[in-house]
Design a protein with these regions (language model features):
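Conserved nucleotide-sensing/catalytic segment adjacent to the nucleotide-binding pocket
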Residues: 54-98
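Hydrophobic anchor at the beta1->P-loop junction of P-loop NTPases
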Residues: 21-24
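N-terminal pre-Walker A segment at the start of P-loop NTPase domains
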Residues: 1-13
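P-loop (Walker A) phosphate-binding loop of NTP-binding proteins
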Residues: 27
Length: 252
């Protein structure tokens, strides 16, 4: 399958010629592993129990393998972060390591990696990345003062724009029917609640209540609302709705 270039690739093109180690962060299935794998000579997938067992027995394999080295789901073995940091301290040549992860480790590394590991965020696919539209206004050019006026057109109508929003920007869902995409997204959300949070040492005591909270929070995106209204929508008059301190904490 031909690799579909992402917006982040422009940053990677530049930074991998000057930075020794890069971390790509973002939600599960957003395309981090595929993008990083396209640039790596060696790939270690630490979500694979067999690979993780080998690396736990010989951690230095991560930093002595042919580079660039991709350490995928590095948070499954938090010590890998410090191994990379020390390797960068020993050799500062650019483009040595790529780290990808979908969650924060239960036991954080002993060092933040500041000055050694640069973090980049990968976001869901834009309409341009999906091949739906071509950009006609550059935000970067506007911020640099290079554009005298803002003018642009698009052939994407409101109905198609709404459909693309509902389809999400996850690359694995491109081309699926609306029903299949909805099923995939429903399963995605269930996995986050039932497994991913627990893997990140964030056990969920009331999965149905958390799901209602997430639905209410999502419905309020890009609106002017209050935490109290989101909390009420999540509770729906039920007795198990989150308390105000819990809602404030979970809502960020």
């Amino acid at each position: 399958m031909q690799y579909r270039r992402r917006v982040l690739d422009d940053q990677l093109d530049e930074l991998m010629t000057g930075v020794a180690a890069l971390e790509i962060v973002g939600p599960r299935a957003v395309g981090k592993t595929e993008t990083a794998s396209a640039r790596a000579r060696t790939v270690f997938r630490l979500d694979d129990p067999g690979t993780r067992a080998i690396i736990e027995g010989d951690p230095e394999r991560l930093v002595r393998s042919p580079r660039p080295v991709l350490i995928d789901e590095w948070q499954r073995m938090p010590s890998s972060w410090d191994l990379v940091r020390r390797a960068v301290d020993a050799e500062r040549s650019p483009g040595q390591f790529l780290l990808t992860g979908s969650a924060s480790p239960a036991s954080p590394p002993t060092h933040t990696g500041a000055g050694r590991i640069v973090s980049l965020r990968m976001r869901p696919m834009t309409l341009m990345e999906r091949g739906i539209a071509s950009p006609s206004v550059s935000l970067a050019a506007l911020l640099r003062g290079e554009a005298e006026r803002v003018a642009g057109t698009t052939g994407v109508g409101l109905d198609e724009y709404a459909r693309q929003m509902l389809a999400s920007g996850l690359p694995g869902l491109l081309g699926l029917s609306d029903r299949s995409a909805r099923a995939e997204l429903d399963g995605y959300l269930s996995r986050v609640i039932d497994r991913d949070l627990a893997d990140a040492a964030l056990p969920v005591r009331n999965a149905p209540a958390l799901r209602r909270w997430m639905e209410a929070y999502a419905a309020a995106i890009s609106t002017t609302t209050s935490l109290a209204k989101i909390r009420e929508a999540a509770g729906g008059g039920r007795s198990d709705q989150p308390t105000r301190p819990t809602a404030a904490r979970e809502g960020g």
